[in-house]
Amino acid sequence: MSKVCIIAWVYGRVQGVGFRYTTQYEAKKLGLTGYAKNLDDGSVEVVACGDEGQVEKLMQWLKSGGPRSARVERVLSEPHHPSGELTDFRIR
């Protein structure tokens, strides 16, 4: 499998519902590095790097709604090339 990185923006009721922490748990379970960060517009930015198949599994999880307490309306994503080395999956 090839290594890939994506950046995704998750919209809906995704702040104040444990979304970043649950995303971190799922990403670590899949062996991914990156981060989840709240944005000022109420969305969450997710950067995920790792094996292509595992990144795709995280994207499917995000698109399926994430944690039960969240309500995901849409997910936009594109390939990403982080400027530094990501060694863990963190909350920002």
UniProtKB/Swiss-Prot annotation:
| Disulfides per UniProt | C5-C49
Entry's EC annotation: 3.6.1.7
What is the enzyme's class at the highest EC level?
hydrolase
Q: Reaction catalysed by this chain?
A: an acyl phosphate + H2O = a carboxylate + phosphate + H(+)
Gene Ontology terms, MF aspect: acylphosphatase activity
Supply the alphabetized keyword list.
Disulfide bond, Hydrolase
**What SUPFAM superfamilies has UniProt attached to this entry?**
Acylphosphatase/BLUF domain-like
Q: Where is the Acylphosphatase-like domain?
A: 5-92
Name the residues annotated as catalytic in the UniProt entry: R20, N38
* Family the UniProt entry places it in: Belongs to the acylphosphatase family.
PANTHER family from the UniProt entry: ACYLPHOSPHATASE
What is the protein's name according to its record? Acylphosphatase
Q: Which organism is it from?
A: Escherichia coli O6:H1 (strain CFT073 / ATCC 700928 / UPEC)
- The gene behind this protein is yccX
